[in-house]
Swiss-Prot record:
This is Ribosome-recycling factor. It comes from the Bacteria. GO terms for biological process: cytoplasmic translational termination. PANTHER family: MITOCHONDRIAL RIBOSOME RECYCLING FACTOR PSEUDO 1, RIBOSOME RECYCLING FACTOR. It comes from Rhodopseudomonas palustris (strain BisB5). Gene3D superfamilies: 3.30.1360.40, Ribosome-recycling factor.
Length: 187
């Protein structure tokens, strides 16, 4: 956003970005079900550098509680196995040739409650990001009105549009959180 003009679509895009970031973070939270996104944060020591797991292997979900990691290069199997074990996801791979199988253990009730708290923290951070975007948008509108570049009626209309976008995005964030919470607590 620029100080000399206001674009509601830019505000909506930035708010949507906060929602998308939350969706990505929630996808990484482990539930009792297998999900390929669980392994997204795993970094493998490959070819003298750290690489995301998805650049050296294919991750699939053959069963609801099983992940399968097909390593492309036979020489990388041990490095991938070590990266998964070191990732603090609580997963121990069973290696069969170039395929690693990861059984997803049941989560106990305490761990589920912990994960719900983490999900709430992620959601609150996303809400704060949305509020910052709203504040930035409202500040620009106020400056434009003070500089007499827009009328007071336009200011009120734009303020209302920004608030509507904020409410819609916060509602979307709340829905993402509710869905993830339900998924985590489902035994």
């Amino acid at each position: 956003m620029q100080s000399e003009k206001f674009d509601i679509n830019e505000v909506k895009r930035r708010m949507h970005g906060a929602s998308q970031a939350l969706q990505h973070e929630l996808g990484g939270l482990r539930t009792g079900r297998a999900s390929a996104s669980m392994l997204e944060p795993v970094q493998v020591d490959a070819y003298g550098t750290h690489m995301p797991l998805n650049q050296v292997a294919t991750v699939s979900v053959p069963e609801p509680r099983l992940l399968s990691v097909q390593v492309w290069d036979k020489s990388m199997v041990k490095a991938v196995e070590k990266a998964i074990v070191d990732s603090n996801l609580g997963l121990s791979p069973a290696t069969e040739g170039q395929v690693l199988r990861l059984r997803i253990p049941e989560l106990n009730q305490d761990r589920r409650k912990e994960l719900v708290k983490v999900a709430h923290k992620y959601a609150e951070a996303a809400r704060v990001a949305v509020r910052h975007v709203r504040r930035d948008g409202l500040d620009i509108i106020k400056k434009l009105e003070k500089a007499h570049e827009i009328s007071e009626d336009d200011q009120k209309r734009l303020d209302h549009e920004v608030q509507k976008a904020t409410d819609a995005t916060i509602s979307e964030i709340d829905q993402l959180l509710a869905n993830k919470e339900k998924e985590i607590l489902t035994v």
